[in-house]
Amino acid sequence: MLDNYLTLENAQFEIRYVEGEHRFAQEALGILSTALPSITSYFLLSNPFPKVRAVLVTHRNEFDRLVRDLLRVEIEVPSHPARLAQPQRTDMVVLSPSAYASHSIFTYIPAQFRRLLIHELVHMVEEQLTPDMEASPRWWSEGLAVYLSEQWRYEDEFRKAALDGIAQNNIPGFRQIEAERTLAYDWGWTIVWFVESAYGRHMIVRVVKECADGNVFSVLGETATSLETRWRNWILAEGRLTSQSRVGLRET
């Protein structure tokens, strides 16, 4: 399945790539190797993390093929040009930045590529820790990945909807966020941030490790209504989303 791919690896990561992509393979290896210790430390992970394989592809068709055949994940064909990566267990398929112009809606920006890979690595660590990844609400998993990768801090794709919603006093309820995919990305990270602020990092870790049925609120000792009220009041605090002080991964 990967017969024509070259390999660049260290003890923790294996990057598979095609000829001409060595630059991006090196970049990916460096990003992942630097990020994993920070992520595992955040989640208080003491056991060694399994070796991770990332496959860089240069065409949308190859991306779809490997997501389907290597990862065994159902995917629309052709997949949406906004889709750049897909993790599953300890494998991830990533559209190479060299293919962005032809096969995506994005322009390659090194810092955004870094945050994308960290986002996917957070999903991988969560999957290793959680009792049932499929039961985890999308807003929680995506919120966690957007928050810890700090995409929310720098990228309008993740940040603008929340900022605009707050400015216009148009904040969705939890039921809407749970029901709509785009809202999970737009607002999930704000809920994760609130949980970390209100309960501490240990509660984030506890939710990931204990939430087997998808009921995040139960682990928190809250109802959806009570948490939504507290979150809404918190998020409306003056300057909340523009604050640059937080505990988590650091921009480098």
Where does each model-flagged region fall?
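Juxtacatalytic substrate-recognition/specificity segment
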Residues: L2-M133, P137, N215-V219
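Acidic/His/Gly-enriched intrinsically disordered linker/tail segments
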Residues: R83-T90, Q112-L116, M124, Q128-T252
